[in-house]
């Protein structure tokens, strides 16, 4: 079966321009497109263009950050005629099939090969060994949320042999990592097309929404800790040249950890949950509500703190408001997550309390309101609970 655009998919003008821009750049580059504008479909339209140029003989590898995105991408790939191999978790679930289909592809028995994997599996030694056997002249790589691929443990796994490289992200530049960002663009190519939030809303590609910040004061202990961390950050930054914006955190782990620790403090501020409850009590009806907790970019010890925060939020919503609230985190299995999303859309779950998993690219069209407790916005001793409200009826 050919990898091609299904008849019922009508590319929007901006998607066609994105495909043309990437092709004009020699088959390399990054698409910087606002979340919700159809980066997935745009990239698959690009792959369909490549397949047509190659007489349908193409090996396509798609790397995404999280397991639940593998399943989401798989549905779209099947719409384009692909029969993807889902390569993540245990090798026994995918390696034999991948090696078999790769052998058929090399022999010319199979026209197309499509693999969807997580960034973690992509970087693994076992996957890299298989990847090294792919015909470089017919190999295309799509990296979803490409900014993640600039991390030290991931950028080393990017295969130099592959010539067709497409990166996708609403925010391709890495936070306080100029070196990682530069190496990312050196590999994937520069940003070849941009489609921002304002333009997308103006053109009707995204719905309008209200963004409402709610100020929350830090407790006395949190304020003291925040000031101490800020002084430490200033001191460490001064040793690196004095300008935090010009500091490469990869060369200053102490500064990196201090910034993450301060972000954790703001993201899990004690009074945010109290303010959230106050706001929800003002609602006539609570349904199809997303609540974001913690900072998905923070790992290790910091991750433990944010997990406790998400648990506390869910428990409070149940106990004080009687809400049918459920967690949506990396701890839930693939089947559990799919069930949660289905129940949320049906209205059986009134609120999903999420950390990290919903931040990047998961489709939840039923959402009416989102509360973001994880905002890093702060001034002195205050932080914010941010509300997004869909204005579409």
Q: Whereabouts are the PLM-identified features?
A:
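A short beta-strand element within the Helicase C-terminal
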Residues: 353-355, 360-375, 381-386
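Conserved helicase ATPase core of P-loop NTP-dependent helicases/translocases
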Residues: 93-107, 127, 290, 309-359
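Conserved Walker A/P-loop ATP-binding site and its immediately adjacent core
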Residues: 40-45, 56-80, 297
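Conserved helix/coil segment N-terminal to the catalytic DExD/H
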Residues: 93-137, 148-156
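Conserved pre-motif I regulatory segment
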Residues: 1-32
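Conserved helicase/translocase motor-coupling segment
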Residues: 236-340
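Walker A/P-loop
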Residues: 26-48, 353
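Post-DEXD/H (motif II) to motif III coupling segment of the RecA-like Helicase ATP-binding lobe
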Residues: 148-209
């Amino acid at each position: 079966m050919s990898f091609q655009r299904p008849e019922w998919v009508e590319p929007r003008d901006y998607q066609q321009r994105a495909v043309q821009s990437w092709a004009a750049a020699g088959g390399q580059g990054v698409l910087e497109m606002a979340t919700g504008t159809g980066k997935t479909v745009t990239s698959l339209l690009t792959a369909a263009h490549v397949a047509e140029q190659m007489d349908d003989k193409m090996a396509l590898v798609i790397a995404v950050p999280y397991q639940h995105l593998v399943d989401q991408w798989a549905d779209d790939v099947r719409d384009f005629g692909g029969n993807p191999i889902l390569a993540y978790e245990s090798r026994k679930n995918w390696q034999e099939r991948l090696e078999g289909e790769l052998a058929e592809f090399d022999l010319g028995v199979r026209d197309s090969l499509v693999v969807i994997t997580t960034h973690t599996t992509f970087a693994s030694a076992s996957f890299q060994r298989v990847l090294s056997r792919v015909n470089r002249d017919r190999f295309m790589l799509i990296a979803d949320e490409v900014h993640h691929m600039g991390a030290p443990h991931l950028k080393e796994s990017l295969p130099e042999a592959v010539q067709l490289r497409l990166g996708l992200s609403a925010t391709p530049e890495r936070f306080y990592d100029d070196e990682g960002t530069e190496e990312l663009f050196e590999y994937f190519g520069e940003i070849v097309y941009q489609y921002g939030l304002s333009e997308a809303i103006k053109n009707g590609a995204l719905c309008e929404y209200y963004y409402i910040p709610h100020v929350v004061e830090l407790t006395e202990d949190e304020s003291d800790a925040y000031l101490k961390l800020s002084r430490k950050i200033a001191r460490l930054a001064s040793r690196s040249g004095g300008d935090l914006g010009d500091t490469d955190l990869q060369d200053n782990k102490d500064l990196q950890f201090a910034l993450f620790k301060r972000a954790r403090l703001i993201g899990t501020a004690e009074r945010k949950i109290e303010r959230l409850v106050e706001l929800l009590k003002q609602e006539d009806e609570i349904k199809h509500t997303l609540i974001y907790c913690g900072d998905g970019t923070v790992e290790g010890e910091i991750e433990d703190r944010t997990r406790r925060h998400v648990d506390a939020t869910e428990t409070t919503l149940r106990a004080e408001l009687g809400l049918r609230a459920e967690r949506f985190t990396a701890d839930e299995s693939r089947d559990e997550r799919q069930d949660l999303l289905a129940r949320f859309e049906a209205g059986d779950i009134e609120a999903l309390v999420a950390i990290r998993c919903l931040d990047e690219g998961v489709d939840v069209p039923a959402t009416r309101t989102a509360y973001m407790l994880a905002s890093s916005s702060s001034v002195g001793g205050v932080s914010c609970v941010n509300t997004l409200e869909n204005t579409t009826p």
